[in-house]
């Protein structure tokens, strides 16, 4: 029997707000560059509104690319099947074989709060990447909210996830691990 269950990873209100603010900040240089280019190309005769410099053009290209890549690497959801737990992302999905999972449980309260981000993002489309926290050590987060999280422990790595219906997620995964 090939069971497969999908759990969404939806952004909470705080993440939605911070993502919106950062998106405006990242995309503003691209919009300004387009505006100045348009004004320069189609401005009134005899009026020279100026040209965007190479730095602004580079920034205008890099910042939207950063926004796209950050979104593409954010967790969209989690798939549990008979063989693997898959962290669904547009770029570089993460596969954790069920045979490597030693424990699944509700995450410690506030595990993400106060953590040191070693590599990844905190508050722009998610909380994902490599983190460290005193009393926890290094862990990998692939979450879209700060509460109702789940810890997945393998022999080498601790994962922190944010599936919808965390209790059901833990039960479904736990049942497969006991087989």
Regions found by a protein language model. Name each.
Residues 1-50, 150-158, 168:
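N-terminal membrane-targeting/pre-transmembrane regions
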Residues 2-13, 88-155:
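Non-transmembrane, membrane-adjacent beta-strand/coil modules in membrane-associated proteins
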Residues 48-56, 119:
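Glycine-rich, flexible loop segments associated with nucleotide phosphate handling
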Residues 53-68:
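Canonical hydrophobic alpha-helical transmembrane segment
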Residues 65-105:
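Conserved beta-hairpin
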Residues 155-179:
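Cytosol-/stroma-facing membrane-proximal "stalk/adaptor" domains immediately downstream
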């Amino acid at each position: 029997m090939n069971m497969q269950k999908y759990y969404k990873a939806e952004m909470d209100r705080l993440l939605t707000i911070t993502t919106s603010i950062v998106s405006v900040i990242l995309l503003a240089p691209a919009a300004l560059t387009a505006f100045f280019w348009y004004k320069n190309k189609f401005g009134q005769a005899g009026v020279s509104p100026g040209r965007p410099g190479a730095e602004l053009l580079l920034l205008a290209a890099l910042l939207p690319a950063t926004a796209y890549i950050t979104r593409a690497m954010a967790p969209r959801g989690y798939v549990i099947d008979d063989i693997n737990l898959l962290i669904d992302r547009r770029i570089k999905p993460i596969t954790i074989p069920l045979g490597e999972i030693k424990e699944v449980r509700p995450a410690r309260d506030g595990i993400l709060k106060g953590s040191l981000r070693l590599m990844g993002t905190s508050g722009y489309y998610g909380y994902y990447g490599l983190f460290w926290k005193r009393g926890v050590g290094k862990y990998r987060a692939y979450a879209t909210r700060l509460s109702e999280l789940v810890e997945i422990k393998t022999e080498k790595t601790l994962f922190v996830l944010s599936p919808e219906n965390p209790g059901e997620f833990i039960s479904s995964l736990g049942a497969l691990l006991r087989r």
